[in-house]
Curated annotation (Swiss-Prot):
GO terms for biological process: hair follicle morphogenesis; non-motile cilium assembly; positive regulation of smoothened signaling pathway. InterPro entries: GORAB. This is RAB6-interacting golgin. GO terms for cellular component: cytoplasm; cytosol; Golgi apparatus; nucleolus; nucleoplasm. Pfam families: Transcrip_act. Residues 1-43, 55-133, 302-368 are annotated as: Disordered. The keyword Translocase does not apply. It comes from Mus musculus. Interacts with RCHY1. Interacts with SCYL1 and RAB6A/RAB6. The keyword Nucleotide-binding does not apply. Residues 11-27, 114-133 have a biased composition (Basic and acidic residues). Belongs to the GORAB family. It is found in: Cytoplasm; Golgi apparatus.
Length: 368
């Protein structure tokens, strides 16, 4: 019979339209889905079953939700309407796509559309009892999560408050310590600056004195070098002069000695010619007497000088007395040659009793 059926007639279609329930929702046209969409829907369904959700939507944290959880729970509704039982008068097509022949081609009336929307709103307003139980479970879960989150938030706030208080206390203590340290550092810096100023002033004074002393030292060194050079030259000159003086005195002594030797030889020759023998002892005594007289004269002169220094007004009388005393022994001392006969002075210029002036000069030179 299915093969002989050719479709609905116009009368049958009219009758179906008249007998159709206005509150019955329009059957959705099935849409072919790809393999990826099917896998995705399957994964979403598994995840919703794990989390206890029926509609397959992933659960979110309360702080991630944009609206209140109750409104979200109330807004959820079953998207797939209950399938309408096919009437015996509406057979399916042989192709299996679910389309009724002739229905898609005919336009739908606006009254039917309004009745369809009213039926949907009635379904939303009157949910099934299973949905209510699930909503209550969701609300309880969300409330428990919300309370846990609130407790955690309170704990975190208390911890943050304590941490802030500790940080403020630590900052205050550190600031006090830093202020005390800065005060100490400033005081130490001032003391060091004062010491540096004192040291710098002392160093400046000492440097000026050192510069002055170095200049004076350089002048003294130059003068010392000049004096040393002059001293060395003077010493060398003195040494040369002393050497020349010694040489000249030696030469003079040798000349005088040679002259005296010649005189002695000459006198011996003359005495031999005159057959006169010289008394050597008398000559020696005469020389000693002359030396004593000279020594007495020198002592008298020294005494006169000392007396003049002590008492200058009476110096003339004392000097006259000393001169008289010195003259008296000269008068009283007789010459040994006058006592002997044949030794008196004669007209002969070469007599032995008359001393030679050259011999006197020689004796004076030897005495000096």
């Amino acid at each position: 019979m299915a093969q002989d059926w050719a479709g609905f007639s116009e009368e049958e279609l009219r009758r179906l339209k008249q007998n159709k329930d206005p509150f019955e929702p329009q059957r959705r046209i099935p849409v072919k889905k790809t393999r990826q969409q099917l896998q995705r829907e399957k994964a979403l369904l598994e995840q919703s079953q794990k989390l206890g959700l029926q509609d397959g939507s992933a659960s979110l944290l309360p702080e991630q939700l944009l609206s209140a959880p109750k409104q979200r729970a109330n807004s959820q509704k079953p998207r797939s309407p209950s399938p309408v039982a096919p009437s015996p008068l509406t057979p399916t097509s042989s192709s299996g796509d679910g389309k009724l022949p002739g229905v898609g081609s005919q336009p739908q009336e606006p009254g039917l559309e309004n009745s369809h929307h009213g039926h949907k709103s009635a379904e939303v307003r009157a949910p099934k009892p299973d949905c209510k139980v699930e909503k209550k479970k969701m609300e309880l879960q969300e409330k428990s999560r919300w309370e846990v989150l609130q407790q955690e938030q309170r704990l975190m706030e208390e911890k943050n408050k304590r941490k802030k208080a500790l940080l403020a206390q630590a900052i205050a203590e550190r600031s006090k310590k830093t202020q005390a340290e800065t005060i100490k550092l400033k005081r130490i810096q001032k003391e060091l600056q004062a010491l540096d100023d004192m040291v710098s002033a002392d160093i400046g004074i000492l440097r000026n004195r050192i510069d002055q002393a170095s200049l004076e030292y350089s002048y003294a060194r130059k003068r010392f070098d000049r004096a040393e050079a002059e001293y060395i030259t003077a010493k060398l000159d003195l040494q040369r002069k002393t050497e020349t003086k010694e040489q000249l005195t030696e030469h003079l002594c040798t000349i005088i000695q040679q002259n005296e030797l010649r005189k002695a030889k000459k006198l011996e020759e003359l005495m031999q010619q005159l057959d006169v023998q010289a008394d050597e002892e008398a000559l020696q005594l005469e020389v000693e007497v002359e030396q004593l007289l000279r020594e007495q004269e020198a002592e008298a002169a020294k005494q006169m000088a000392s007396v003049e220094r002590l008492c200058p007004p009476d110096g003339e009388s004392v000097s006259s007395e000393l001169a008289e005393e010195n003259n008296e022994p000269q008068k009283q001392a007789p010459s040994p040659e006058t006592d002997k006969p044949g030794k008196c002075c004669s007209s002969s210029p070469h007599r032995l009793d008359c001393p030679d002036p050259g011999a006197k000069n020689f004796s004076a030179a030897v005495a000096t």
